[in-house]
Design a protein with these regions (language model features):
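Bacterial N-terminal signal peptides that target proteins for export
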Residues: 1-9
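Extended active-site neighborhood of metal-dependent phosphoesterases/phosphodiesterases
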Residues: 75-129
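N-terminal active-site segment of His-dependent metallophosphoesterases
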Residues: 20-78
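Bacterial N-terminal signal peptides
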Residues: 9-17
Length: 129
């Protein structure tokens, strides 16, 4: 998980540095942090947020979901998170990282099986993410 957090921090820092350069265009980044409550209790709000990003794709450079997609690492929450984030497929560039909630109630065991099922490496490695 530390590797993912470092990668997200590096990406955010790179974007901030590049956006501050006068020769670079402005970077328009949408952040989706801690969506676990939406995945668990308010999926319509999460779908609305993601639909907004899709509808404004021409004015968005990148969407970053910052972890904690689920609250309890269960199928029902992963299904909501995956179906919602997949709305952006081929419409707006996006990436995501796992958060501590995504690893289960006892995150010391680091159970990423459901994450791997809903966000398979084969699908996202093709996109270069």
């Amino acid at each position: 998980m530390k590797k993912h957090l470092r990668l997200a921090a590096l990406l955010a820092t790179t974007i901030l540095v590049l956006s501050s350069c006068s020769t670079q265009k402005q970077v328009r980044l949408v952040l989706l942090p801690d969506i676990q409550t939406y995945s668990r209790l308010y999926p319509d709000i999460l779908r609305s947020q993601t639909q907004w990003a899709v509808e404004h794709a021409d004015s968005i450079d990148f969407v970053l979901q910052q972890g904690d997609m689920t609250d309890h690492n269960i199928d029902k929450e992963w299904a909501v998170a995956a179906s919602t984030l997949n709305m952006m497929d081929d419409k707006v560039p996006y990436a995501f990282v796992m958060g501590n909630h995504d690893l289960g109630k006892n995150s010391n065991k680091r159970d990423s099986q459901l994450f791997n099922n809903y966000f398979p490496y084969a699908k996202y490695s093709i996109r270069g993410i």
